C-alpha cells in the first residue's frame, strides 16, 4: 500500500494525470502547462506511523523528502514526532494519512486541521474515509484553500459525494491501494489465521468490528 501512496504523491506534485490529458486533448504546442514542483526537500507529515506509515516513510526518504509524523505515541525512529496534529499540519507540504480506521481516528482530519494546512499543500488518504471530514475537505478543494488531494478511500463507498468528481485538483481511486497480488495474498493469510484462532478459542490476530467503519 505504501508504494501506491508514493505514486499518488508523485502524481500530485508532478501533475502526471494532467500531462497525460494534455497529450490526449492535442494541446501540445497549442498551450503551455503550468510548472509543477520538485519533491526534493519537501516536508511530508504522516498520520499514523504503523507498518504502512513506516514503509511509506522509508520510500519517501529515498526521494529526499523530510519526514514528520503524528500518532498517539513517539516511536524509536529517526523522524520528527508531533504530538499536536495541528502543528504538524502547518509545517508540511503533504499530509499523508495511513492510520487505522475506527472510533479513535474518526474525523481526526477535521476542518481545523484542514484549515491549518498551507495553501500549497496536498492531502493523501489511503486509510479510511471516516478519518476525514469530507465536507470540510471538499470546501477547501473547491475554494483552493489547499493545492489538491489524492483519495483512495471515502465515506459511503462506493457512493461517494459526486462533487469530488467535478474537481480538477483531486485524484480519485476506488479503494485499491491494497490491490496487488502480494498484498491480497497476505490479507487472505491473515483472514485464515483469524478464523483458525477463533475456532481454537485463541485471540484473533486483529480485532474485527462490525459493522465495518470505512
Regions found by a protein language model. Name each.
Residues 1-43, 55:
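Phosphate-binding beta-alpha-beta segment of Rossmann-like dinucleotide-binding domains, i.e.
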Residues 43, 57, 62-66:
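Residues at the starts of beta-strands that form the adenosine-phosphate
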Residues 53-54, 110:
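N-terminal Rossmann-fold NAD(P) dinucleotide-binding loop
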Residues 1-4, 18, 35, 157-214:
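C-terminal helix-to-coil terminal segments
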Residues 57, 61, 141, 165:
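Gly/Ala-rich phosphate-binding loop of Rossmann-like dinucleotide-binding domains
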Residues 73-163:
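Rossmann-like adenosine-cofactor binding region
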Residues 49-50:
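Glycine-rich Rossmann-fold phosphate-binding loop(s) that bind the pyrophosphate
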Amino acid at each position: 500500500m505504501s508504494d501506491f501512496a508514493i505514486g499518488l504523491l508523485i502524481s500530485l506534485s508532478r501533475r502526471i494525470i494532467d500531462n497525460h490529458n494534455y497529450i490526449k486533448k492535442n494541446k501540445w504546442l497549442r498551450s503551455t502547462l503550468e510548472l509543477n514542483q520538485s519533491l526534493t526537500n519537501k516536508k511530508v507529515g504522516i498520520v499514523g506511523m504503523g507498518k504502512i506509515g513506516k514503509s511509506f516513510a522509508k520510500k519517501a526518504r529515498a526521494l529526499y523528502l523530510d519526514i514528520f509524523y503524528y500518532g498517539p505515541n513517539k516511536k524509536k525512529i529517526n523522524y520528527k514526532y508531533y504530538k499536536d496534529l495541528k502543528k504538524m499540519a502547518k509545517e508540511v507540504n503533504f499530509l499523508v494519512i495511513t492510520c487505522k480506521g475506527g472510533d479513535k481516528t474518526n474525523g481526526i482530519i477535521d476542518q481545523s486541521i484542514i484549515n491549518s494546512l498551507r495553501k500549497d499543500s496536498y492531502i493523501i488518504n489511503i486509510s479510511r474515509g471516516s478519518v476525514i471530514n469530507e465536507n470540510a475537505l471538499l470546501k477547501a478543494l473547491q475554494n483552493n484553500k489547499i493545492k489538491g488531494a489524492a483519495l483512495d478511500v471515502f465515506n459511503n463507498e462506493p457512493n461517494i459525494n459526486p462533487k469530488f468528481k467535478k474537481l480538477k485538483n483531486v485524484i480519485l481511486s476506488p479503494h485499491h491501494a491494497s490491490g496487488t497480488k502480494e498484498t491480497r495474498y497476505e490479507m487472505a493469510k491473515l483472514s485464515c489465521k483469524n478464523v483458525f484462532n477463533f475456532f481454537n478459542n485463541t485471540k484473533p490476530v486483529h480485532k474485527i468490528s462490525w459493522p465495518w467503519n470505512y
